[in-house]
Amino acid sequence: MTDPIIIAIDGHSSCGKSTMAKDLARAIGYIYVDTGAMYRAVTLYSIRRGLWKDGVLDTETLRNEMSDVRITFRLNAETGLPETYLNGENVEQDIRSMEVSAKVSPIATLDFVREAMVREQQAMGKSKGIVMDGRDIGTTVFPEAEMKIFVTALPHVRAQRRLDELRAKGDATTTFDDVLANIEERDRIDSTRAVSPLRQAEDALVLDNSHMTIPQQKAWLLERFQEVTGS
C-alpha cells in the first residue's frame, strides 16, 4: 500500500467539485472534507442570528461570536457520506438553500472567518489520506498537497446543474437566471477577494468538466491518483 497523500480539489462554484471529491474519496478509502460546507455553515449561523440588516452583515458581532460556531462532520450510515453539523444540529440541507448561496461569498471574504476555517481544515489533514475540496485548498490550506486539481466548467452548464439540484430538493421557484446571476457574482467575489482568492495553483492539473459525465470525471481522477501514487 502506498503512503497516504493529500488531494486538493479547487475550482469555481457549482462545477461538481464536491460530487467528484466524494466519489474519489470513497473509491480510494480516503476521508472527504467539504470545505465549502464549512463556510455555508457559518453563513447559516449569521442568518439565523439575524446578523444581516438590509443586505449588510454585522461583521463585528460575527467576529465576536466565531468561538460559538462549532462545525463538525458526521458520517451518514445509510448514504456512507459525511453530513454537516452546526453546533450539534444536522444542517446538511439547510446550508444548500439559495439564501445561503447568495450570502456565502461575502462571508468567505472575511479574514477572521477564513483564518478560523483554514486552521480547522489543516488540523483535519494532519494525518493525510484526505480529499478536500474548496477554493483555496491547493494554494493556502495545503500548498504542499501531493495532488492538486483545479476544476472549471462553463457558467451556463454550472447554472443548470445547480438548478437541477434545487429542483430535486423541492425548490420550484428559483429560476435559471437567478442561479446564473448568483454563480457569476460568486465567481467575481471569489476571484477578487483580498484573502485567499480563487486561483489555480501553479502545479495543479486542470479539469474542464463542462461536457463530462460523472463516471468520466471519476475515471479521470482515479487515473491521476494512480499516476501520482504509482499504485
Swiss-Prot record:
Keywords: ATP-binding, Cytoplasm, Kinase, Nucleotide-binding, Transferase. It is found in: Cytoplasm. One of its GO terms (molecular function) is ATP binding. One of its GO terms (biological process) is pyrimidine nucleotide metabolic process. The gene is cmk. This is Cytidylate kinase. Pfam families: Cytidylate_kin. Belongs to the cytidylate kinase family. Type 1 subfamily. Its EC number is 2.7.4.25. InterPro entries: Cytidylate_kin (IPR003136), Cytidylate_kinase_dom (IPR011994), P-loop_NTPase (IPR027417). It catalyses: CMP + ATP = CDP + ADP; dCMP + ATP = dCDP + ADP. CDD domains: CMPK (cd02020). ATP binds at residues 11-19. GO terms for cellular component: cytosol.
